[in-house]
């Protein structure tokens, strides 16, 4: 009987070896190695300029005054993004919101954008959000607005791509009568 048990156990081990069962993982690479197989995004830096396309106001803002604060909501403007990357180079609809001091014009600005590239990207657009501060520049009648933005591609060949950028605007007047901005950023794609 002992011999029969030994033979059965031996055949069981041989059978398991033949079908590939073992206590070793059959994964071709370890979990640590699997992480290195994931694609890292391609980073494409870009620079550019941001300025209004006359007549740039598409929709007037709703403005409320609260003490020294001027609260603006829903101003829609048409702008030109002249960028070194043809994926970002195009026109932008910018919805601006903000809270500014009535005397100094300083405050916070935030909003959302839709950028339509001039390049044929299969109908895709960029959608994003931004926030920042506007402060007096030291030159009378000029303010500096520094913005940080994040966005993503929707549709066409830019679907799934992302961008991150910084914009520095020199703004004329309070309320603004015009501006010229510099853009620096990166596009992230897989």
Model-derived features: where do they sit?
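Bacterial N-terminal signal peptides that target proteins for export
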Residues: 1-8
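C-terminal motif of bacterial Sec signal peptides marking the signal peptidase cleavage site
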Residues: 17-20
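Beta-strand-enriched cores of mature, soluble protein domains
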Residues: 24-190
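Short, linear, compositionally biased motifs with a strong N-terminal bias
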Residues: 10-13
């Amino acid at each position: 009987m002992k011999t029969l048990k030994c033979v059965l156990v031996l055949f069981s081990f041989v059978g398991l070896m033949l079908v590939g069962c073992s206590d070793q993982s059959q994964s071709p690479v370890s979990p640590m190695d699997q992480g290195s197989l994931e694609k890292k995004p391609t980073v494409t830096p870009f620079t550019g300029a941001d300025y209004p396309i006359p007549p740039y106001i598409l929709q007037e803002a709703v403005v409320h005054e609260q003490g020294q604060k001027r609260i603006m909501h829903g101003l829609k403007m048409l702008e030109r993004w002249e960028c070194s990357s043809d994926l970002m180079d195009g026109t932008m609809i910018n919805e601006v919101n903000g809270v500014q001091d009535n005397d100094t014009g300083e405050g916070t600005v935030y909003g959302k954008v839709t950028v339509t590239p001039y390049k044929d990207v299969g109908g895709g657009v960029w959608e994003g959000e931004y926030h920042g501060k506007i402060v007096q520049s030291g030159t009378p009648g000029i303010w500096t607005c520094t913005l940080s933005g994040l966005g993503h591609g929707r549709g066409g060949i830019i679907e799934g791509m992302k961008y991150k950028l910084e914009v520095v605007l020199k703004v004329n007047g309070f309320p603004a009568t015009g501006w010229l901005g510099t853009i620096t950023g990166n596009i992230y794609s897989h």
